[in-house]
Amino acid sequence: MGQRLSGGRSCLDVPGRFLPQPPPPPPPVRRKLALLFAMLCIWLYMFLYSCAGSCTAAPGLLLLGSGSRATHAQPALVTAPNETSPKMPFRAPPANSLAAGKDKTVGAGSQEEQSPEAPDSPSPISSFFSGAGSKQLPQAIIIGVKKGGTRALLEFLRVHPDVRAVGAEPHFFDRSYHKGLAWYRDLMPRTLKGQITMEKTPSYFVTREAPARISAMSKDTKLIVVVRDPVTRAISDYTQTLSKRPDIPSFESLTFRNRSAGLIDTSWSAIQIGLYAKHLEPWLRHFPLGQMLFVSGERLVSDPAGELRRVQDFLGLKRIITDKHFYFNQTKGFPCLKKAEGSGKPHCLGKTKGRAHPTIAREVLRQLRDFYRPFNRKFYQMTGRDFGWD
């Protein structure tokens, strides 16, 4: 047996001397409370992080850009507004030539508002909550115009926590209407109560069927049109086309049907799109003027916060987007957002934004301004706003 100790006891008789006992387990209740507290802390952190990202998110830095495709179609003689005997014929293409998206001169595919960069991906935390809400048809649509600054406006609006927008252009009301509203709705992001669903497709403004189709979806849809001096818009359109197809004819040769006679070729989409008054007429047959907002592409560059204030009021949103969200990029000459959506870093959208335009002869610019002047004045009258292009 074991060694005897004083008092006649063996070492085996002394509890815990050579065989230490494990500590008693913690009470089950205490263990459960600790686990519950840890889970609560993790959930609270994720919730606050998601909220912070939603409230401070800003879209990728926006630069108003240039360029698009050139198209030609068989002309049809039309007269300029307020002129009984036009100095030069206005030849419009067939009804669907602008909306078809087929470019005989430079190939298919809208380049302007099919942004060269995909929108920023949502953060993992935001994705955790992406299953909330439901998909709704858009309550507001940016319908035009191409190369006017629609991508800039949409990205600026995405700073607002109550605006949810589709990143790519759906082209539903001009190219995919046959797929039905259920297909269209499925393209939309999920929204919560109080949030607005938006999309932008600039070609809608020059698509004759679009006004009736959007009205059939909802007569209450709010429409936003970003417009820009039609001469600089046409040059911007051409500039982007030139970057994709360096072998296309010169701007001057595409502008005129007969250079010596000074006849403008309005079958070229770069010229046709700038006839804003003509394109606005069918929209006013389906929507009251009060449901349309006309945004200045020039002021979107010089005073983005001012134009965004008008847009937020039009959409019934709280004025959250202000001067503090923007800074001016001296290199490109355009405003940018201080924070990209889903991150805290500034970012300018698109390396092609702010690129130099080709030099156009002064005489060509003068003839174009003379051509557009009556259409511009008619547009000012129709919208109640002088954009100062003349």
Swiss-Prot record:
Keywords for this protein: Disulfide bond, Glycoprotein, Golgi apparatus, Membrane, Signal-anchor, Transferase, Transmembrane, Transmembrane helix
Record field: transmembrane: 33-53
UniProt-annotated binding residues for substrate: E169, P170, H171, F172, F173, D174, R175, K200, T201, P202, S203, W268, S269
Gene this protein is translated from: Hs3st3b1
Membrane side Lumenal: residue ranges: 54-390
Name of the protein in question: Heparan sulfate glucosamine 3-O-sulfotransferase 3B1
Cytoplasmic compartment residues: 1-32
Organism: Mus musculus (Mouse)
Bilayer topology annotation: Single-pass type II membrane protein
One Gene Ontology molecular-function label: [heparan sulfate]-glucosamine 3-sulfotransferase activity
Biological role: Sulfotransferase that utilizes 3'-phospho-5'-adenylyl sulfate (PAPS) to catalyze the transfer of a sulfo group to an N-unsubstituted glucosamine linked to a 2-O-sulfo iduronic acid unit on heparan sulfate. Catalyzes the O-sulfation of glucosamine in IdoUA2S-GlcNS and also in IdoUA2S-GlcNH2. Unlike HS3ST1/3-OST-1, does not convert non-anticoagulant heparan sulfate to anticoagulant heparan sulfate.
